[in-house]
Every structure is written in C-alpha cells, then in structure tokens.
Amino acid sequence: MRLLSFLLAIAPLLLEGAPQISLTSPTDYEVFQRQTRYEGRVRIAGSVKDAPGAQVEVRLVGSKRKGEWRPVEAAAQGAFDIFVTKPSGGWYHCEARLTKDGQTLAETSVAHVGIGEIFLVAGQSNSANHGEEKQQVRSGMVSSFDRLNWHPADDPQRGASGNSGSFMPPLGDALAAKFGVPIGFIPIGIGATSVREWLPAGVPFPAPPTLVYRVSQLPDGRWESNGVAFTTLVSRQQQFGPRGFRAVLWHQGESDANQKDPTRTLPGSLYQEYLGRIIRDSRHAAGWDAPWFVAQVSYHVPGDEASADIRDAQAALWKKGLALEGPDSDALKGDLRERGGKGVHFSGPGLREHAARWAERITPWLEQQLDQK
C-alpha cells in the first residue's frame, strides 16, 4: 500500500518534462479551399514542449499513399507553422511527431482533413435550421464551421439560427459527388431577418422591418441596424482570408416582401440598394471580391407566393454583375413546404429539392472557375 501511494505521489513528477507535441491546425473535419482543380494548401501548425534537440516532422496521409515525413523547424518558443500542398480530396490523416536519434518521442494526429470547396451561407430562416426535417450527410464528405470548430454537417448547422433542418447536408452531398472533394459550409443565417438588419451599423433607412430586435430608431426618425449580422458576415470571411472560401450563398427576402403592415414592406429599389451595399462593403472589409450567389426569395404562404418587386431587385443584382444567379426558391410550393404546404419553411422533400436547385446553379459556374486555373 505504501508503494502504491508513493508511485501515485511521484507520477506527476515523472510525467513533467516528457516531450509533447500538439496541433492547432488542422482540426478534425476541417476543409481547406483548393486553389486549383487539382491541389490546395493545408496549414499545419502547433507547438512542442520539453523537447530540446528534437526534430518536428509532419505528413498528410491519403487513402492510397502514406506521404513522406517533412521536417519542420520550430521557433524558440516551440511553435511551428507551415503550409503543405497536396492534391485536392480527402479525407487526409494529418500526423505530427517528435524524433531524436531515430526514436519517436511524441506524436499526435488529426483524422479528417479535406482539400475541397467551402461556401458561406447567409440570409434568413430558409438559409438556416428552420426546415421541417433535420437532414443528414450521406456521403461522409461534408462538414461545417461554427466560428471555432469544424463538425460533420448533420443538422442542425451550428452557427446559424434554429434547431431543425437545412439544405446544406444534401447540397454538400451533391457537390461532393460531382467534384469528388470534401465540401465545407460556414452557416450564419438568422431567422426572420430583413436585409435591413444585415446592413452595417450607421447606415440609415426610412422604415423598420416587422421585427425590430436588431434595429433602433435614430433621433431624426430614421432607423439603423445594430450591425451585428454584418459584423458576423465580415468576421467569418476574415477568418478564412482572401480566397479562403469559394462563394457566399445568400437566401433572404421573405421579411422584406409583402408585410402585413405595408409600412414595413421594403420597396424593391431599396432592397437592391441595401443588398448591393452589403455585398460591396463586406468585400471591402474582407479584402477581396468574394463571389455572391443571390437567390430569388419572397414566398410566404399559399396565396402570398411572390413579390415581383423583391424578385426584380434580386435579379437586378445579377444583371449588374454584382452577384451571380441563385435558385428561384419561390417556385418550391405545395408539399415542398412545411405543414402540408401551408408554411413558409421547407418540408423534408423541399429541403432536398432546395439543395438540388442550388447545385444546379453552383455546378456549371464552379466548373468554369476550375477550368480557368
């Protein structure tokens, strides 16, 4: 008994000073945006501790080949940070180790690392988790990012509002099947938001949206957004850096179209102006001209199925070259909507059809982008 107590007492001392290696990048299920059809760069970063004279080595292991160990020089404080170029695809297995005199002193790994396509998804409830049925990833090749961590992209999508279904799992599956690479999403949609609520703080507008949680009235009677949604839009882009994701997918418009109080309805001319402002200002803040897909969105319920004014405003952004043409989700009616066709959100079949419509818009454009590089 005395021997056991002694060993337990000195165990922390024995462990103290043991060589250690850890990874801060990549994280599990992280997707890196590929630069060309054929390759992309993975950031491998971490730190070592209590390893004087030891060599840091890293490698990415694919399903068909192990890959060579690559020596990395650690800074005096023990940090290391490099980029490794590899063929597009995944999942890769990232490994890092400490060696000295032919012996492995410590090692660590990350199981799922992808080089593929990343999309930021923004807008209101039908861009988020408010569909009738939660969707699941079928391919095993789709993940999403919640500001801090990556996860398999099963609904609900962390980072967006709501706790039910979205179109992202089936869209990711469709794109992964088409392009043969992992797909990543950055979900930031907020249910019930007007385009006015996505404006930067300090941009005045004449009348508030129906819900006023994210806006406030100015002394002169006009209104402004609190800027939180815009800040999130910009900060996510900045996290990934210039060309660190492929495009923004914007799905929004219901909360600006045909409101019960007509004074809360946004004229199409202002919708076009405000969304154009959001696109331009977010590009400037992010430091690059991220492509935007803008869907046609204004459907509420049967009998209130479209606003020509809002639809024309959305289409005007395509025609001006400020945005790319997204799907026409107003066309999804009947049993593709929740509650047997009575609601504004999508049913399970509607979410899958919504995903298919997005894939139809994204695929030819993405093929063209990949052919240019």
Each language-model region and where it sits:
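Bacterial N-terminal signal peptides
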Residues: S5-L13
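Cell-envelope and extracellular/periplasmic
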Residues: A18-K373
